[in-house]
Amino acid sequence: MTSLLITGYKAFEIGISTEKDMRIKIIKEAAKRDLIRFLEDGVDWLVFMGNLGFESWVLDLANELKKDYEFQTATIFLFENQGENWNEANQAKLAAFKQADFVKYAYPTYQNPSQFRDYNQFVIQNTDGAYLFYDEEQETKLKYLYQEMKKQEQYFIKKLTFDDLNEVAENFSGN
């Protein structure tokens, strides 16, 4: 496996409204543990979709880990105008996604609902697996992407779950 799609909940979907929320540190701690394992197992591309929340937190980690591991990052945005209405703090996160080693846009702008399905299929077909923060008990629109992933026979899926986070939280020192 060489390319891994990174995606998961947006901050608001799990009730996080500020970057100072302690849960972000716990999520990042769990994700860092998993990312290191992936990189040591030979992943050399982390592919993002340019979403706030889990993806932006993992992108922060990826940029830190580049000091110690050799891999590249890619952002494949759904639309060229993605994030244009985001506030200033989120614009900085958008800029970080645009600083990836490879940046591509699936479509110039929204035209019809089939773009979402086609985009999901495209990112799955162009990655070897996914690392996703998702729990089927707390459904969001991410369920459509997850369902497509499960249909692929050889597609690796590693989920970060709330149970995983609870385990990390029990041992978390906060540093």
UniProtKB/Swiss-Prot annotation:
Gene3D superfamilies: 3.40.50.450. SUPFAM superfamilies: MCP/YpsA-like. InterPro entries: YspA. HAMAP family: UPF0398. Belongs to the UPF0398 family. This is UPF0398 protein SSA_1858. The lineage of its organism: Bacteria, Bacillati, Bacillota, Bacilli, Lactobacillales.
